[in-house]
Amino acid sequence: MIRDIDENLARSLTAETVELLPFLPYLLQDLWELGSSPRDMITLIKRHIPLSENSKILDLACGKGAVSVRIAESLGVHVHGFDLFPDFVKYAEQKAAEFGVDKLCRFTCGDANETVETERNYDCVIFGAAGNILGEPRETLEKLAKTIKFNGFIIIDEAYLPDDMTNDDVKYQNYEYLTRGEWLQLFDECGLTLVEELQNTDDYDFDSDNKLISTRTDELIAKHPDKRAIFENYVASQLNECEDLESNITAITWILQKKD
C-alpha cells in the first residue's frame, strides 16, 4: 500500500521511479507554483462560492502552498493545506508569513489518502494537478466529496484527452487520460454538478522552469553520478509532459458542486 502511494506521488510530480522522491525538493527548489494556476482557482472561487469569515478551504497535495497563500491573500479566507513533503510544507509556511497570511493559512505534512478520511465540512476542496494519488478518477472524486459540506465545491485541476486522440498519442505515460465526455459522465454518476470549466490559457513559461530543473539536475548528477539515468529520465519526463500539455491533451480546471 505504501509502495503504491509512493509510486502515485512520484508520477504526480513527473517522476518515473520512487527512487527520485528524496531528490524532488532539491530539483524543484527554484519553483513555487508546481502545476496549478492560483489565478484560475481564485477566479472560480470568486464567481461561484459564497464566502464568509467562517468559510474554510482544503488544499490537498498543496505542494509549496502557492495556491493556498494566494487564495488567502486575495480572499481573506482560511485555507488548510496538506502535502507529503516536509520541505514543501516548511516552504509554504515561510511563504504564508512572507505574504502576511500566516494567520489564515495552516499547513500540515500528511498523506492525502489519510487526510480525506479525517477532514470534513469544508466549503471547498482543491485538488490541483495531483494526478492519481487518490486513485482512479471515480475513487478520487468520491474521496474529495467526503471532505466538503452538502452543496460544497470541488476544484480539480486535470487534463482530458481530445476526441481525436488516444492515450497512445500521449508522450508522458503516467496514467490513462479520460475524454471530456467520460469525465462528464463520471461527475454525474458521483453526484457532482459541473458549474464551470476553465481551459488553461496561461502563457506559462515552461521553458524557464525546465531550465531551472535542468540546472539542478546537473548539480545532482555531479554529486550522485550513479543516479545519472534517474535524473536524466526525470528531465525527459518533464519535457514530454510539457509537450503533451501544448499538443496532445487539454489542461482544464473544473469547479464542481456536490448535489443534495
Set out the residue ranges of the language-model regions.
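N-terminal, positively charged/glycine-rich alpha-helical extensions of SAM-dependent methyltransferases
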Residues: 1-25
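Conserved alpha-helix/loop element of class I SAM-dependent methyltransferases that forms part
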Residues: 35-53
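Class I SAM-dependent methyltransferase SAM/SAH-binding core
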Residues: 58, 66-114
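A short acidic, Gly/Pro-enriched loop at the edge of an enzyme's catalytic core
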Residues: 116-125
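A short SAM/SAH-binding and catalytic strip from SAM-dependent methyltransferases
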Residues: 124-136
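A short glycine-rich, Lys/Arg-flanked "PGG" loop and its adjoining helix->strand segment in the class I
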Residues: 138-153
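Short, glycine-/aromatic-enriched active-site segment of Class I SAM-dependent methyltransferases
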Residues: 155-175
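Conserved Class I S-adenosyl-L-methionine
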Residues: 198-260
